[in-house]
């Protein structure tokens, strides 16, 4: 069995958890304008922008390289959490399992955290651990903060 693991980190954000959650849950089409240095495009492959089970295709830049990611969306409104379950793409060439959960938690009236949990399993033990992808998704949440505050 190949190596697997879970990374967890928290990104401090400003404003309301509801507003941030809404952006990640149903406004992905705004990502290229908001954080175009990371995300160049997001398209719907199956479903609707805000539907549980929707399949989206992302064009992004990680470590200076253009990549593509196809994911199935899981939505948990009660816990303000969105899961991106990896289906295909560059990251899936290295990993059998790649699930990223973004959960938005209000800490005070003006402060929230985005708790990011990445669950992964390598295709084989020769593949590197996906720490670069954790760094990437952490930067997505941090860089989206200003754009959400201005919305």
Curated annotation (Swiss-Prot):
One of its GO terms (molecular function) is copper ion binding. It comes from the Eukaryota. SUPFAM superfamilies: Bet v1-like. GO terms for cellular component: cytosol; mitochondrion. GO terms for biological process: defense response; response to phenylpropanoid; response to zinc ion; vegetative to reproductive phase transition of meristem. Disulfide bonds: none annotated. It holds the Pfam family Bet_v_1. Belongs to the MLP family. PANTHER family: MLP-LIKE PROTEIN 328-RELATED (PTHR31338:SF18), POLYKETIDE CYCLASE/DEHYDRASE AND LIPID TRANSPORT SUPERFAMILY PROTEIN (PTHR31338). This is MLP-like protein 328. It comes from Arabidopsis thaliana (Mouse-ear cress).
């Amino acid at each position: 069995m190949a190596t697997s693991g879970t990374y967890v980190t928290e990104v401090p954000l400003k404003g309301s958890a509801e507003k941030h959650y809404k952006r990640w849950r149903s406004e992905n089409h705004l990502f290229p304008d908001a954080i175009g240095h990371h995300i160049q495009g997001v398209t719907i492959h199956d479903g609707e922008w805000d539907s549980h089970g929707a399949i989206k295709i992302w064009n992004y830049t990680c470590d200076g390289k253009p990549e593509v990611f196809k994911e199935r969306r899981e939505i948990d409104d009660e816990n303000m959490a969105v899961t991106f379950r990896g289906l295909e793409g560059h990251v899936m060439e290295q990993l059998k399992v790649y699930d990223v959960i973004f959960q938005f938690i209000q800490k005070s009236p003006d402060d929230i955290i985005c708790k990011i949990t990445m669950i992964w399993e390598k295709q084989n033990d020769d593949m590197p651990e996906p720490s670069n992808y954790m760094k990437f998704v952490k930067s997505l949440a941090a860089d989206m903060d200003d754009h959400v505050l201005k919305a």
